[in-house]
Amino acid sequence: QRQMCIETGAAFPDRKIHLFDTFEGFSEKDITIEASGNLSRAKTGDFSSTDIDSVLHVMPDPTRTVIHKGWFPDTFSDVTDETFCFVSLDADLYAPTAAALPLFYERLATGGVLLIHDVYSTQFSGCRKAVGEFCLKNHLFADPVCDLHGSAMIENYKKKRRNRYLPEPAFLF
């Protein structure tokens, strides 16, 4: 994640970077959903070791970093007027991923990219389920990314001219 912060800051040197995190790990509510669907072995509080100061310390320019602490999507109300050119979504679990996808995609600039971590991860199949449902509902395609996290990316095709010879986008299962 440190390297991702550095590279994102370098790629967008003149933009604000919004970071959404609970800084408390996974919630009991989300873990209950994961367990009922046999989607992961995650536990309440996993990933709770992240703190705001350590995150700001690795950001190339902390003055351009906006922290949104709390449970997603509740914290999204702070940015309803924003348009995003790049979103890196690493929610891991089904419920927060399913809640985040439509909110961010709706505000993604034309040609913007939504990068979702753990889509092809064997550790968090709830993320894959959420992305699959979102792509099928919206006729989108999640392109696999060759990384260690099983990531995929969705490009915003709104208003963008599509090649009429390409097949309709879908999600790879």
Feature roles, as predicted:
Residues 17-20:
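Conserved SAM-binding motif I beta-strand of class I
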Residues 128-147:
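Conserved Class I S-adenosyl-L-methionine
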Residues 31-80:
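S-adenosyl-L-methionine
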Residues 15, 60-66, 138-140:
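A short helix-to-beta-strand connector/capping loop
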Residues 1-5:
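Short, small-residue-biased leader/transition segments that mark boundaries at the very start
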Residues 24-31:
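A short beta-to-alpha transition loop/helix N-cap that caps and shapes the active-site region
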Residues 65-124:
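Active-site segment flanking the S-adenosylmethionine/decSAM binding pocket
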Residues 158-172:
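Positively charged N-terminal leader segments that act as targeting/secretion signals
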